[in-house]
């Protein structure tokens, strides 16, 4: 019967071309990927059979079987899993690209290891590392048996199978190996790869092996006569006499060697989580981790534990060395924990088993108490699941603290998963305080190394009541912030928060060990002595005419203008109210494509324009205003320039950058002694433009010390 031909999705064609032409040496990982897929197919049929046992009647045994066929240069990998319908063969293997296809190709182009392929969900195509043609024979309980075939070109065929033996249920992958990859037909090589990568797969992996055995066979009549003749000719005395009648009755046989084929199970190891942790080597943990995670690296940390009492379950949880490429993608699978009930795999999609902020953790959980016939809906409402989840989170926080005891290990962990910890601080009310101890930041006293909140508290001077922090786009931006001056002068440490998620986390955290967390870009009370307080009150009165004049000039751009005791070197800064967005949060929210604009206008705090009475610029500006120059164009220009500069140094963006640029250009002209009238005269072609308003000589902008 002629098959139907289909075009591969373009990205899949590119991917196969990349793989088939790769010079990557460690090609053995193809077997790991195909066995992993087979194991997934077996998981699915076993789960279906929990609610409908008849599903297993088409093939009662659950297995993965490898059959080398050296004479044909073919390697067959069969599983008795769920199988694929015709539509699934077309969609899953060719016409619908998975989200990881493009991401994997980009990673490869960037120099990533091809053994990462499984993490991107495209492990099937790894077979083209060793084969240049493949047939997939598949039988699902809901459909006929079909053959899917491809030689990694631009198309594939799907044909109703009328030539191969019936497989009952499941899938056979028939790989036609390249001439330089025939080592994967050798028994020794296959066993080596299985031991390295797939020893802990939950289903028996059978290898069809050829063995030489000795058998006793009856001696043919002609050989018997020759034997008798030889006995007669033999003149040597016999050591013992045998009853002649007995000898007559005994059939004459001989031993011959012959080759037989038999199935040998390659993974007889019992489930790792059922064994005592003290009996398991790190190598075994590493091998098990790789078999369940598709990772090619060893894990960073392992947490193996059991909970007994009213509730019983065992778990092995792994913390990877790196974050996956799609860690925070919304469509990504939210859980990497396989749930078993009394050694029977139930699901790896129990999203309620672990909170989203811990979605990077991989492992297995085996419960003694959950019912076997759990549906997804029942999982969500099950009280036992909630208790298991609570225990898992508790044990993982324990593991993170154990990692923190080794600073080098913790640096690796934190660089990969800091965002997850911060997300946990934001979302997990119950464990917020424990997670806060894991947070690390640069600060004014720890610029080059990260410091913990606990260490910050131990360094606090006696008279310091709060924990201070500043938010911003980058370390460089916050290190030079004018907001730091007064706190540095008092020897108060300030934490640098430069990750967008930091501000969300701190907004929820609010305090640490009884100390309030204070954002210094917002309005706050700074600890001051009685002398400082008296001096501040005096300055407020002295500068009242200036603050009023500046407010009149700036109008609705600011809520108020105040004399600041929190600024030293900088002439001015913009601070926001305690309950609105900071400059940094305003920047983050502006970048949100789907933000609520009404919420933005409500949360964008009214700005307070703070001026420093210690700044020579502010002193000179005060002098000008006191002399009656509040309406002076220079004063207005300088005020606007001062305000816009303060916006930038305080982390805001300018609403009208062109006005700011014009003011700067006028300053440049003055600095270069360029008369604006002269400029216009030397550019007659620009005469059609509106004339520039002449500034009276007595109000010219002056250079201020």
Swiss-Prot record:
Phenotype when changing residue 493 to A: Leads to growth defect at 37 degrees Celsius, probably by disrupting the intramolecular interaction of the N-termini with the middle domains
Region (4 X 5 AA repeats of [DE]-[DE]-[DE]-K-K): 221-259
Gene3D superfamilies given in the database record: 3.30.230.80, 3.40.50.11260, Heat shock protein 90, C-terminal domain, Histidine kinase-like ATPase, C-terminal domain
Amino acids binding ATP: 37, 79, 98, 124, 376
Organism superkingdom: Eukaryota
Record's keyword annotation contains Nucleotide-binding: yes
Record's note on what induces expression: Expressed constitutively at a high level and is moderately induced by high temperatures dependent on transcription factor HSF1.
Compartmental location: Cytoplasm; Mitochondrion
SMART domains, per database record: HATPase_c (SM00387)
Pfam families attached to this UniProt entry: HATPase_c_3, HSP90
A GO MF term: unfolded protein binding
Extent of the Sequence repeats: 221-225, 226-230, 232-236, 246-250
Transmembrane annotation, as ranges: none
Short motif TPR repeat-binding, span: 701-705
Keyword Chaperone carried by entry: yes
Classification via PANTHER family: HEAT SHOCK PROTEIN 90 FAMILY MEMBER (PTHR11528)
Family from the record: Belongs to the heat shock protein 90 family.
Other information: Present with 132053 molecules/cell in log phase SD medium.
Comment field on protein domains: The TPR repeat-binding motif mediates interaction with TPR repeat-containing proteins.
Record-given protein name: ATP-dependent molecular chaperone HSC82
Taxonomy of the source species: Eukaryota, Fungi, Dikarya, Ascomycota, Saccharomycotina
Gene field: HSC82
């Amino acid at each position: 019967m002629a098959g139907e031909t289909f075009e591969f999705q373009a990205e899949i064609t590119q991917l196969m071309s990349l793989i088939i032409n790769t010079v990557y040496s460690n090609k053995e990982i193809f077997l790991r990927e195909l066995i992993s897929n087979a194991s997934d197919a077996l998981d699915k049929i076993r789960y279906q059979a929990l609610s409908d046992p008849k599903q297993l009647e088409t093939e009662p045994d659950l297995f993965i079987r490898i059959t080398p066929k050296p004479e044909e240069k073919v390697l067959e990998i069969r599983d008795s899993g769920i199988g694929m319908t015709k539509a699934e063969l077309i969609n899953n293997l060719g016409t619908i690209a998975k989200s990881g296809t493009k991401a994997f190709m980009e990673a490869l182009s960037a120099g990533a290891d091809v053994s990462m392929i499984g993490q991107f969900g495209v492990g099937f195509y790894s077979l083209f590392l060793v084969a240049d043609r493949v047939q997939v024979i598949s039988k699902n309980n809901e459909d006929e048996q079909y053959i899917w075939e491809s030689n990694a070109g631009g198309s594939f065929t799907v044909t109703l199978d009328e030539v191969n033996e019936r497989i009952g249920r499941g899938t056979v992958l028939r790989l036609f190996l390249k001439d330089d990859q025939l080592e994967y037909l050798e028994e020794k090589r296959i066993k080596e790869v299985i031991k390295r990568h797939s020893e802990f797969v939950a289903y028996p992996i059978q290898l069809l092996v050829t063995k030489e055995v000795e058998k006793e066979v009856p001696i043919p009549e002609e050989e018997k006569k020759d034997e008798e003749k030889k006995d007669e000719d033999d003149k040597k005395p016999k050591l013992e006499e045998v009853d002649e009648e007995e000898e007559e009755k005994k059939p004459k046989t001989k031993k011959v060697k012959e080759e037989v084929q038999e199935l040998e199970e390659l993974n007889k190891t019992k489930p790792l989580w059922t064994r005592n942790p003290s009996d398991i080597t790190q190598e075994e943990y590493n091998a098990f981790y790789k078999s369940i995670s598709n990772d090619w690296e060893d894990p960073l940390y392992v947490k193996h534990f059991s909970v007994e009492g009213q509730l019983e379950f065992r778990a092995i949880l792994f913390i990877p060395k790196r974050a996956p490429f799609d860690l925070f993608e919304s469509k990504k699978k939210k859980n990497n924990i396989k749930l078993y009930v009394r050694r029977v795999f139930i699901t790896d999609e129990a999203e309620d088993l672990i909170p989203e902020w811990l979605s990077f953790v991989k492992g297995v959980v085996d419960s003694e108490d959950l019912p076997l016939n759990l549906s997804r809906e029942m999982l969500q409402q099950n009280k036992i699941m909630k208790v298991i989840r609570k225990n898992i989170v508790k044990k993982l926080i324990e593991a993170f603290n154990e990692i923190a005891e080794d600073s080098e290990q913790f640096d690796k962990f934190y660089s990969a998963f800091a965002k997850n910890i911060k997300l946990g601080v934001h979302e997990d009310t119950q464990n917020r305080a424990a997670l806060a101890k894991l947070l690390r930041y640069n600060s004014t006293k720890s610029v080059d190394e990260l410091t913990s909140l606990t260490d910050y508290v131990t360094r606090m001077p006696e008279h310091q009541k709060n924990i201070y922090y500043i938010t911003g786009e980058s370390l460089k931006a916050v290190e030079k912030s004018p907001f730091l001056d007064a706190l540095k002068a008092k020897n108060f440490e300030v934490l640098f928060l430069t990750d967008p998620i930091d501000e969300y986390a701190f907004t929820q955290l609010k305090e640490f060990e009884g100390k309030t967390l204070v954002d210094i870009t917002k309005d706050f009370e700074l600890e001051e002595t009685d002398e400082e307080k008296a001096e501040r009150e005096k300055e407020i009165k002295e500068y009242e005419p200036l603050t009023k004049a500046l407010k009149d000039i700036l109008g609705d751009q600011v809520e108020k203008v105040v004399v600041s005791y929190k600024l030293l070197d900088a002439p001015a800064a913009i601070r926001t109210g305690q309950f609105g967005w900071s400059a940094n949060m305003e920047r983050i929210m502006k970048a949100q494509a789907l933000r609520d604009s009404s919420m933005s206008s409500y949360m964008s705090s009214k700005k307070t324009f703070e001026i420093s009475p210690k700044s020579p610029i502010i002193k000179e500006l005060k002098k000008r205003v006191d002399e009656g120059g509040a309406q002076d164009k220079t004063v207005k220009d300088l005020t606007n320039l001062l305000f816009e500069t303060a916006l930038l140094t305080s982390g805001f963006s300018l609403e009208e950058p062109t006005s700011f640029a014009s003011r700067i250009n006028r300053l440049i002209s003055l600095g270069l002694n360029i008369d604006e009238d002269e400029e216009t005269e030397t550019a007659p072609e620009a005469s059609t433009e509106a004339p520039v308003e002449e500034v009276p000589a007595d109000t010219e902008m002056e250079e201020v010390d």
